[in-house]
UniProtKB/Swiss-Prot annotation:
It is found in: Mitochondrion inner membrane. This is Cytochrome b. SUPFAM superfamilies: a domain/subunit of cytochrome bc1 complex (Ubiquinol-cytochrome c reductase), Transmembrane di-heme cytochromes. Heme b b562 binds at residues 84, 183. Binds 2 heme b groups non-covalently. Component of the ubiquinol-cytochrome c reductase complex (complex III or cytochrome b-c1 complex) that is part of the mitochondrial respiratory chain. The b-c1 complex mediates electron transfer from ubiquinol to cytochrome c. Contributes to the generation of a proton gradient across the mitochondrial membrane that is then used for ATP synthesis. The keyword Transmembrane helix applies. It is a multi-pass membrane protein.
Length: 380
């Protein structure tokens, strides 16, 4: 029998083992599509970003104009920019759904895969933040000022750290140039981390909705899941292009159509929608250092999730009480997102504080408690 190049060639063999002949559980649902969708998001963002970088000038006097020039004078520049800006939103939608899936189905018990995933999330958040500064509009400038300023809350070294990050005594040209350098670099770091993430995943194989070992009933990834993924691509790229073509500025802030002006502060400084939940938690504590710690904890708490798993069952498929708690957490995050977009006044302050408290309570206290309770219920 002639040797199969796909299985013998050193490079093709790797692709084959991870995308073609990969043994996959036969019962994974559409919730397992988001990993590949994130891959498509990353590819799209790198391609559109590369094309934008060719026309962008990282200088405070030219940045805003260079973005306007791209949209007005470059062939399909407006489309490239709209796809890139809204592609970021879809990236976050996919990653949040992907994390939610992992949480619901107990995928976090693959600890290495989960932890590399959290590092990927943090890198993505950093990339989105530095990218938002590049158009050098009002919200770009003031967002950069407010968020980088948070580091000054770190005792003793805080102020020095912030001035070192800024490259001066305020957000200015050095800040913009280094943010552009970082925004160019980080997506490639994300691509590298993704390979590590997949390496760890393929050590154990995919989890499945029942949370049981599926080795006895696995099917090849291609053609089954390659086809299913292609449908997922179409279902994501369709709303992305629709948004980019019909209402590209729907998720943006009108303030960013005004060039950055250090002398005029916008009435409401707020980040893009995908950071609002964390922003609400930051603002809910009336102390700078406390707020910064809560902000960090809101994402870093994900590292603790595997340690807080007390149930005898892996997934929530057959755990109605945990399901109820899970959807309460989703509702809670929705409330936090809404609060983050509101001004700091009554009743939003108290709602934000209660929602922040509830967020940490559900994750740190209620989930382990309910898991233990469900174990006891299994015995009766």
């Amino acid at each position: 029998m002639a040797p199969n190049l796909r299985k013998s060639h050193p490079l093709l063999k790797m692709i084959n083992n991870s995308l073609i002949d990969l043994p996959t559980p036969s019962n994974i649902s559409a919730w397992w599509n988001f990993g590949s969708l994130l891959g498509i998001c990353l590819t799209t963002q790198i391609l559109t970003g590369l094309l934008l970088a060719m026309h962008y000038t990282a200088d405070t006097t030219l940045a805003f104009s260079s973005v306007a020039h791209t949209c007005r004078n470059v062939q399909y520049g407006w489309l490239i920019r709209n796809l890139h800006a809204n592609g970021a939103s879809f990236f976050f939608i996919c990653i949040y759904l992907h994390i939610g899936r992992g949480f619901y189905y107990g995928s976090y018990l693959y600890k290495e895969t989960w932890n590399t995933g959290i590092i990927l999330l943090l890198t993505l958040m950093a990339t989105a933040f530095v990218g938002y500064v590049l158009p050098w509009g009002q919200m770009s400038f003031w967002g950069a000022t407010v968020i980088t300023n948070l580091f000054s809350a770190i005792p003793y070294i805080g102020q020095t750290l912030v001035e070192w990050a800024w490259g001066g005594f305020s957000v200015d040209n050095p800040t913009l140039t280094r943010f552009f350098a970082l925004h160019f670099l980080l997506p490639f770091m994300i691509a590298g981390l993704t390979l590590i993430h997949l390496t760890f995943l393929h050590e154990s194989g995919s989890n499945n909705p029942l949370g049981i070992v599926a080795n006895s009933d696995k099917i090849p990834f291609h053609p089954y899941y390659s086809t299913k993924d292609t449908l997922g691509f179409a279902l994501m790229l369709l709303p992305l292009t629709t948004l980019a073509l019909f209402s590209p500025n729907l998720l943006g802030d009108p303030e960013n159509f005004t060039p950055a002006n250090p002398l005029v502060t916008p009435p409401h400084i707020k980040p893009e929608w995908y950071f609002l939940f964390a922003y609400a938690i930051l603002r809910s504590i009336p102390n700078k250092l406390g707020g910064v710690l809560a902000l960090a904890a809101s994402v870093l708490i994900l590292f603790l999730i595997p340690l807080l798993h007390k149930s005898k069952q892996r997934t929530m498929t057959f755990r109605p009480l945990s399901q109820l708690l899970f959807w309460t957490l989703v509702a809670n995050l929705t409330i936090l997102t809404w609060i983050g977009s509101q001004p700091v006044e009554h009743p939003f302050i108290i709602i934000g504080q209660l929602a922040s408290l509830t967020y940490f309570t559900i994750l740190l206290i209620l989930f382990p408690l309910i898991g233990t309770l469900e174990n006891k219920m299994l015995n009766h």
